A protein has these predicted regions:
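ATP/nucleoside-binding phosphotransfer catalytic cores, i.e., glycine-rich phosphate-binding loops
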Residues: 194-201, 220, 226-227, 232, ...
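ATP/NTP phosphate-donor binding region
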Residues: 1-64, 71, 75, 113-116
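Short amphipathic alpha-helical segments
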Residues: 17-19, 74-77, 104-106, 220-221
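Glycine-rich phosphate/pyrophosphate-binding beta-alpha loops
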Residues: 148, 152, 208-222, 291
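Short conserved active-site loop signatures built around small residues
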Residues: 67, 207
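Catalytic core of DAGKc-family lipid kinases
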Residues: 29-30, 40, 78-205
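Small/polar loops that bind or transfer phosphate-bearing groups
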Residues: 7, 37-38, 65-66, 94, ...
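Short N-terminal binding/cap micro-motifs at the start of the first secondary-structure element
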Residues: 12-16, 216, 308
């Protein structure tokens, strides 16, 4: 089959499972396609399924799930053939997760059935940018939406450890986890360099390296970010006191935080990030909501690398 539909039934607290029959009905006008349903307990099942399908000749991968499943599918396509595979395989998203942040950034319907109907009507493919994270040990991880470190990674870690929180609280889970992590996190010394700009050194609560504008279940972290402009929006939250961080959360959701004196933003296509001098604790990195490693790391852009059905 030239098309594979990957389904994560647990996405969105079961939203994907509840929508599956209607999604299949909406996709009925398409040529026959295979369906892969992920099972709990497997490591990155959507990634393996996408890789195997592309190696077998698939040219279109559809994902009914959340941002994490979509990111896994992206990495699976890349694992099957690098940039060449990204160029020839289209990715279609049927957003059913808790946050559905990338869909908002990319202009995709945030209802999975509506997105499926658009695909069945012949949604046009558009070229979008893809972020790349490179680690000193040679590992590489791609991301669609946002990569970050600091308190934001601690939030992702908490949601990974307690998935029942997302199942029970839905999008509110991101806010609850943010308040909890923000209250217990202290800024740590980091060094950040964006393109050829001077290095930013100092206490850091969080850094978001954004291809899309929203993350964390509706936080408008990078209001100027575009998924097809070839640039990251880099947002650094500096030496924010715990109380100040929590109080500032409404501004983060509204996208008005750039005026805060401890928030700095810039644009670039290559970012180098490392722990500050003397820092020994791991500073974890999350990408599209999944912990993928720790600093130091290089973040770069693959402009117009992916064919996105939207």
């Amino acid at each position: 089959m030239s098309t594979l539909l990957i389904v994560n039934p647990a996405a969105g607290g079961g939203r994907a499972a509840r929508a599956l029959d209607r999604v299949l009905e909406a996709l009925a006008p398409l040529p026959p396609f295979d369906v892969f349903v992920t099972q709990p307990g497997l490591e990155r099942p959507a990634e393996s399924a996408a890789r195997d399908a592309v190696l077998a000749g698939a040219t279109r991968i559809l994902v009914l799930g959340g941002d994490g499943s979509s990111s896994q599918a992206l990495n699976g396509i890349y694992a099957a053939g690098g940039a060449e595979a990204l160029a020839r395989v289209s990715l279609g998203l049927l957003p059913a997760g808790t946050g559905r942040d990338y869909a908002r950034s990319a202009g995709i319907a945030r209802d999975p059935v509506a997105a499926a109907r658009a695909l069945a009507r012949g949604a046009a493919a558009r070229r979008v940018d893809v972020g790349v994270i490179e680690f000193p040990d040679g590992r590489t991880r791609l991301f669609l939406n946002v990569a970050s470190f600091g308190v934001s990674a601690q939030i992702a870690h908490a949601l990974e450890e307690y998935p029942q929180l997302k199942r029970r609280a839905g999008a509110v889970a991101f806010g609850l986890a943010t308040v909890r992590a923000g209250w217990g996190y202290s800024p740590v010394e980091t060094e950040l360099r964006v393109d050829l700009q001077a290095a930013q050194r100092g206490p850091t609560a969080a850094v978001a390296i954004a291809n899309g504008g929203w993350f964390g279940g509706g936080m408008h972290v990078a209001p100027s970010a575009r998924v097809d402009d070839g640039l990251f929006e880099v947002v650094r939250f500096g030496d924010l006191a715990r109380r100040d961080f929590v109080i500032s959360l409404p501004r983060l959701y509204r996208g008005t935080h750039y005026t805060h004196p401890h928030v700095r933003h810039s644009q670039g296509a290559e970012i180098l990030a490392a722990p500050g001098v003397g820092v020994t604790q791991p500073i974890e990195i999350e990408a599209d909501g999944e912990i993928v490693g720790a600093l130091p790391a290089r973040f770069s852009m693959l402009p117009a690398a992916l064919s996105l059905l939207a």
